[in-house]
Amino acid sequence: MADTKPAAEQSGTYAIVEASGTQIWLQPNRYYDIDRLQAEVDDTIKLENVLLVKDGKGTTLGQPYVKDATVSLKVMAHRRGPKVIVYKMRPKKKTRRKNGHRQELTRVMVESISVGGKAIS
């Protein structure tokens, strides 16, 4: 039986980048929700804080960043995450406090991962 996965998934191409104060594992042609970025819908963003790149040839680990490595992201939409309820109460007292929070998110599609100006995906 033939493998029906895309070529990027078969070879295991991915990059770990630093964005919005967190480290994110990104694979080509997939979308991710990350903390809100200051960009318009359909803009292309280049992330240069690439910590690790893995392709069919091997793994490149940065110290702390991989030299000349970039990840291109396309902004698909701005959205809000699920509501998180924070409820605080003091037992045996009438003190109760309920707050809600929805995180502002940006949905991005990984267009390409490139090292040294050459796209690997």
Swiss-Prot record:
Molecular function (GO) terms listed?
Answer: rRNA binding; structural constituent of ribosome
Show the SUPFAM superfamilies listed in the entry.
L21p-like (SSF141091)
Taxonomically, which superkingdom?
Answer: Bacteria
Cite the entry's keywords alphabetically: Ribonucleoprotein, Ribosomal protein, RNA-binding, rRNA-binding
Indicate whether Lipid metabolism appears among the record's keywords: no
One of the GO BP terms on file: translation
Q: Mind telling me which residue stretches traverse the membrane in this protein?
A: none
GO CC annotation: what is one?
A: ribonucleoprotein complex
What this chain does, per the record?
This protein binds to 23S rRNA in the presence of protein L20.
Tell me its family: Belongs to the bacterial ribosomal protein bL21 family.
Task: Write down the PANTHER family for this protein, in alphabetical order.
Answer: 50S RIBOSOMAL PROTEIN L21, LARGE RIBOSOMAL SUBUNIT PROTEIN BL21M
Q: Which NCBIfam families match?
A: L21
Q: How does it assemble?
A: Part of the 50S ribosomal subunit. Contacts protein L20.
Q: What is this protein called?
A: Large ribosomal subunit protein bL21
Source organism of the structure: Synechococcus sp. (strain CC9605)
What are the top taxonomic ranks of the organism? Bacteria, Bacillati, Cyanobacteriota, Cyanophyceae, Synechococcales
